């Protein structure tokens, strides 16, 4: 075990359509099926964050929210830049895009992964790892300080996997 490793003392559960980043060490957890999560990390400052999106892209600027991959990734890159990150120091990881028994969901899953790759490439951000596709959902725990992810692959996603808190800060 690395004696210099810092164990994050803060945790955040990331819902679909949200972006979270922090200069403090955090463990960010999320759950994805056909949706995609992208972790972004600045190798110099150790600034880390994650987003989760449901749909690949929104062409119109009206109603552009972080549920769309092109919007969420572009906005998170902007957030990192505003914190002083240089694009050359940014590294990313992509998770999700699982297939299902529904043809429409399969198409969305493939487009979600394709959008994540293309938008990151457009911004000049290197993808250092991917865990995408397949038929299993994923529970992800991302360490923002060390840029490490722990991935649990699951057959089914329960409602409590998506919403582990009862709204009053207590786990359900």
Curated annotation (Swiss-Prot):
Function in brief: Probably deamidates glutamine residues to glutamate on methyl-accepting chemotaxis receptors (MCPs), playing an important role in chemotaxis.
Family the UniProt entry places it in: Belongs to the CheD family.
Encoding gene (name): cheD2
EC number: 3.5.1.44
Entry protein name: Probable chemoreceptor glutamine deamidase CheD 2
GO BP of this protein: chemotaxis
Gene Ontology MF: a single term: protein-glutamine glutaminase activity
Family annotation (SUPFAM superfamilies): CNF1/YfiH-like putative cysteine hydrolases
Pfam families, A to Z: CheD
Keyword set includes tRNA processing: no
Organism of provenance: Syntrophus aciditrophicus (strain SB)
Keywords: Chemotaxis, Hydrolase
Catalytic activity: L-glutaminyl-[protein] + H2O = L-glutamyl-[protein] + NH4(+)
InterPro entries cross-referenced by the UniProt entry: CheD-like_sf, Chemorcpt_Glu_NH3ase_CheD, Cytotoxic_necrot_fac-like_cat
Top-level taxon of the source organism: Bacteria
